[in-house]
Amino acid sequence: LASKLFDSLRNKIMPLADDVIVYPGHGAGSACGKKMDKETVSTLGHQKKFNYALREDTTRQEFIHELLDGLVEPPQYFPANVLMNVHGSAGIDAILKQGMNGMDVATFQSAWEQTDALVIDTRSKEEVPHGYIPDSIFIGVDETFAPWVGTLVPNLLQPILIIADEGREEEVIVRLARVGYDNPIGYLRGGIEAWRAAGHPLDTIWELSAEEFAREAGTGNTINLLDVRRESEYLTEHMVGAENFPLDFINRNMSKLDPHKTYYLYCGGGYRSLIAASMLKSRGFQHLYNIRGGYKALRATSLPHTDKMVVNTAL
């Protein structure tokens, strides 16, 4: 397939005029490709200048190597979605009817216990650290949402209960259904405030700024620093002393961590590391700090980082 792609790019795409407008099929962060830009429109001329796959002097074998090198295995929901497309799945109306089931706190608790549901808190990364339902996990709907659900929740039939800002419940359900999660069974009516008003406890995730972490690192105490970005991002550049612990494989690798140790987590900007922290806390890890602003903020401190490397195969 990579060889055929080489031919189609050179024989059908590259001969077109430079002012041809290009729209991406996928956005930055998608597992459907690598080195994808966040821009939503481009020109073929711009792509010829900056896209590694369109360099004129690249040989077939060089193209195949660059395209395939460093590719990680696809998220587990990809093949499951293929089977759903072949055999069919529930219609969106039925999924919405089931999922748009607003529950009071008592009903929500009962449904959680009886179905062994997964509670996903979809609020913002700014809100969640200050108070969320214990044992729920955070995946924010305002950021890369459905792909991370698909990567981190192995069972597409998993019953899901939703915590969402008022008025956004339907959006969450639709976005879950787009990647095959057709079993949301309801949401907490009144959200986190209803839970709080009922007198139930809230959990928190400790956070600190990059500057605060730099001061902590300067005390001489042992620091366990986890970089939860993808391996390609880590290889490009990372904080000295950080261990790569990609969020993509957290379920597989969690046993490698010691729940009695304190861990500091960072990603690119603070979103993925907060997901990781919530998942670790749901599995019994208590001594966790999320570094706000992620690597971008850490790089601006006096702490050492590796020299930047050009990784053409970055995902």
Model regions: which residues?
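Conserved, hydrophobic alpha-helical core segments of structured domains
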Residues: 107-123, 138
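Short, well-ordered loop/turn elements at secondary-structure boundaries
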Residues: 17-18, 113-116, 133, 156-157
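Short amphipathic alpha-helices and their capping/turn segments at secondary-structure boundaries
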Residues: 12-14, 107-113, 212-219
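Metallo-beta-lactamase
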Residues: 1-74
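Rhodanese-like catalytic fold shared by cysteine-dependent sulfurtransferases
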Residues: 2, 46-83, 87-89, 97, ...
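A contiguous, basic/glycine-rich beta-loop/short-helix subdomain that forms a polymer-engagement track
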Residues: 96-107
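Short, well-ordered beta-to-alpha junction loops that form the rim of enzyme active sites
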Residues: 24-28, 34-35, 80-82, 122-124, ...
